[in-house]
UniProtKB/Swiss-Prot annotation:
Protein's UniProt name: ATP synthase subunit delta
Originating gene: atpH
Pfam families reported in the protein's UniProt record: OSCP
Major subcellular site: membrane
Keyword Nucleotide-binding in record: no
NCBIfam families referenced in this protein's UniProt entry, alphabetically: ATP_synt_delta
Organism: Synechococcus sp. (strain WH7803)
Gene Ontology CC entries for this record: plasma membrane-derived thylakoid membrane; proton-transporting ATP synthase complex
Length: 182
């Protein structure tokens, strides 16, 4: 188990236990996704919260002003604990681990899908249904990213399984088979 995952797991497990007890796991999971998106996209926020120069009290105050109205108290308490213990550098790992544990406890599979272009709602529903039938779990969560280098089609990653239905993948496979034939 990687060191960061070892550090993140106890915090994530504690948060899941608290949110399950308060019946707010679904809300907190959605808030974790939103917070991760902000954390990943805002270098200024990340730099400020992970700076050793800022005191934990200042970090807690800033987090409270930024997020208090938007997140559940249990998630805010986690952020404050991480700030107190100088562990905000691991925030993304803790949130990702929480989401993993949340999905595990709810029997939800995560499928990473790369598409050449954005999918319509109908295409997304059809893709979700197809992936769900392949996986066989209770439900599937789709993490969709646009990758123009695929030219057309999509690539699905579910755990260690990869399904490449992209045009670039077909061209690559055709090139390999032609190279073998010559």
């Amino acid at each position: 188990m990687p060191l960061l995952n070892t550090l993140a797991t106890p915090y994530a497990e504690a948060l899941l236990q608290v949110t399950d007890g308060r019946s707010e796991s679904d809300d907190v999971a959605a808030q974790c996704k939103e917070l991760l998106a902000v954390w990943d996209s805002s270098t200024a926020l990340r730099d400020a919260m992970t700076s050793p120069v800022l005191e934990p009290a200042a970090k807690k105050q800033a987090l409270a002003q930024l997020l208090a109205e938007q997140i559940k108290p249990s998630l805010m308490n986690l952020l404050k604990v991480l700030a107190d213990r100088q562990r905000l550098t691991a925030l993304d790992a803790v949130l990702r681990r929480y989401l993993e544990l949340y999905r595990e406890s709810r029997n939800i599979s995560l499928a990473h899908v790369r598409c050449a272009q954005a999918l319509s709602d109908d295409q997304t529903k059809a893709l979700t249904a197809k992936v769900q039938s392949m996986v066989g779990t209770g439900s599937v969560e789709i993490d969709l990213t646009i990758d123009a280098s695929l030219i057309g089609g999509f690539v699905i990653n579910i755990g260690s399984q990869v399904i490449d239905a992209s045009l670039s993948g077909q061209v690559r496979r055709l090139g390999l088979s032609l190279a073998k034939a010559s």
